[in-house]
Amino acid sequence: MSTAITRQIVLDTETTGMNQIGAHYEGHKIIEIGAVEVVNRRLTGNNFHVYLKPDRLLDPEAFGVHGIADEFLLDKPTFAEVADEFMDYIRGAELVIHNAAFDIGFMDYEFSLLKRDIPKTNTFCKVTDSLAVARKMFPGKRNSLDALCARYEIDNSKRTLHGALLDAQILAEVYLAMTGGQTSMAFAMEGETQQQQGEATIQRIVRQASKLRVVFATDDELAAHEARLDLVQKKGGSCLWRA
């Protein structure tokens, strides 16, 4: 009988903001880390939660997302002061993060600012992007944290603003539901049912082929576009370019 221990850390961060052009983390700082420990698919209560002083002002847009004020952070520790404790907490675990590129980008940037030759996070942790997992399970569907909560009937009523620990706790519940083998057949058949209903009421019209030349984006261009929209939606809560 296997006695292997699987340790996962479900993690989320809040930041001073993000860049729309270039590296999304450059010049910005992490102001909150929330992490929830899951061992063998059980929440242990051994969580990591800290607010951080960024030594810079927050962007107004970021404040609108998480509601954390500059004044509140003045007496909080800096990332440098908690870095060792944080690394000890996550080292060797599988990190589960929704749109992992956002948070890992910030974490690696913060580590690099310490000038201690700390390696990339993915060298001492396995990183799993729960957004990528959700997209494979539900292609073409909305897979934001709120959408997944609705799909799995998980209570997120307290999520009026983004908060790292609350979001990590909610994501832990969502991820356990996603990977627990209890997905309702209704999820898989949702699109098929809608299509069948639509075909009963829609009259198909054959149009003449257009002579206009249509230029399609390449796979790389589409991937880059989706990655940027992910970052916008991650910390904005919504994205104008997505339904």
Language-model features, listed with the residues they occupy:
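Alpha-helix initiation and N-capping motif
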Residues: 83, 142-145, 222-225
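Acidic two-metal-ion nuclease catalytic site recognized across multiple nuclease folds
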Residues: 2-3, 177-243
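Amphipathic alpha-helical transducer elements in NTP-driven molecular machines
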Residues: 80-83, 127, 142, 165-168
